[in-house]
């Protein structure tokens, strides 16, 4: 009999995983403060990593990688892309981005001039001068100059401003209380017809205890309800595809797709009929490359291969596609929710790949088979 504890009662994904484990008959749930467990389904923040792996004779597995925030916080992701040797030279799939701290945080501002040594020791150096230099250069060259400011820890469309005015973006951030990212806005996205609408793509990725990377074969497009207008920044419903914003502010929510969600099979049919291309060849190949590049760049920092406990993690990668069919990584979510119709299959995959590979069913000598729902990258 294996044992597990649940420390996050708000996760719908791990509520389903918990249900599946109990249904096997060989998993028992313990009180959340019991230290002698095999599996912890923990909370994303303040997880007690330091207390794991110290119970004699007990293998312990936890559902997060310590340090995964290097990918999952917007400012940290920008820093990773700029400083990682694996990414900084070849990363053409991440929008131009700058980390900006509100001036009320008393953060040193990095000089933009060449030849001046940057204060490397201070990890909170502000990049606003670099942003302004790029902004002014684009303005002089007559390039598209729309940018988006996003709170590093924000979610559900909160803490966001889209503007073509640098001063407006910086004033917005300086009025806030936390670090933001200013990112080049994708001004020419691929649009869905009918409706001339924006979308983004959510892909779910599972990293097991051996740092094998699995992509869930199903993905979802989160679609806008209103026609895209690059000049109207005030209408969030045509720019931001977050469910919360679409549901609350758009009178056309659900008009084109139920719940403003389109799944991969329908999207592939759309691409085939509208553009004479396939999802796999035109978009998924790029998505797989980006996912693998990101995760391999942080493996040395977060892998648990040589620690007394082991980790796995489900991640949500969010992408956009431009009109040239180039895929751009927008952000990575460390505790992603899941579309309702996908819960059963996705959560069964977590059990089969991430949990049963460490704690196999006691009545079988067979190695658990990789579910067809996941593709190993």
From Swiss-Prot:
Names of the cofactor(s):
Mg(2+); K(+)
Got a GO cellular component term for this one? spindle microtubule
Among Gene3D superfamilies, the record links this protein to: 3.40.50.11480, ATP-grasp fold, B domain
Known catalytic reactions: C-terminal L-alpha-aminoacyl-L-glutamyl-L-glutamyl-[tubulin] + L-tyrosine + ATP = C-terminal L-alpha-aminoacyl-L-glutamyl-L-glutamyl-L-tyrosyl-[tubulin] + ADP + phosphate + H(+)
Per its record, how is this protein called by name? Tubulin--tyrosine ligase
* Function in brief: Catalyzes the post-translational addition of a tyrosine to the C-terminal end of detyrosinated alpha-tubulin.
Q: Which Pfam families match?
A: TTL
Please name the GO terms that the record assigns under molecular function.
ATP binding; tubulin-tyrosine ligase activity
